[in-house]
UniProtKB/Swiss-Prot annotation:
This is Transmembrane ascorbate ferrireductase 1. Residues 224-239 have a biased composition (Low complexity). It comes from Arabidopsis thaliana (Mouse-ear cress). Heme b 2 binds at H83, H156. It comes from the Eukaryota. Keywords: Electron transport, Heme, Iron, Membrane, Metal-binding, Translocase, Transmembrane, Transmembrane helix, Transport, Vacuole.
Amino acid sequence: MAVRINAMAVTFVAHALAVIAAIMVLVWSISYRGGLAWEATNKNLIFNLHPVLMLIGFIILGGEAIISYKSLPLEKPVKKLIHLILHAIALALGIFGICAAFKNHNESHIPNLYSLHSWIGIGVISLYGFQWVYSFIVFFFPGGSTNLKSGLLPWHAMLGLFVYILAVGNAALGFLEKLTFLENGGLDKYGSEAFLINFTAIITILFGAFVVLTASAESPSPSPSVSNDDSVDFSYSAI
């Protein structure tokens, strides 16, 4: 059941938080951590791609995909296409971000998949990919019957929100893990970089909260030109 809040009323805050989070992670990675690179003698530059791609590419674009489906006053076929494409881009960038972490670890001779953050991350990206593939087949092409779509919709929405919330929580865990490593290496616990990392995590969590709120809010009224098949309410869709 939708919360009695119009989705348009909360999307502005979500978009603003997304911009702030993106700027903060870029400032951290470029100004404090030295920049971004796929090939570099300084392997830390390779790792810097990981938080940038996972936050901007995976968390923010994934959130914008959810928001777009709930807040855009467009016909449902158009919203479905935008929703699908944004999630595909988010998934691709998320995979690229994980590859950057593996590349950094391999070239720095650091073990892979030893932390809770990495375990949850692999689980999240796997569930996200599974959700996208089955959603493409059922809701987009070739598409299931109206009864099949209606029956799977609650599970589609519930799994989508679960995966997204898990992704946001794991992002916060990743910031904490990296900050702990840096502090163990001598970073000032009360320095500007430590505060920047912590506040980036907080903004990320707030963005995720507003995305979930948008997904639970009422959608704009559908256009009267939408066909009967598309009049089925897919507005609670999360992925």
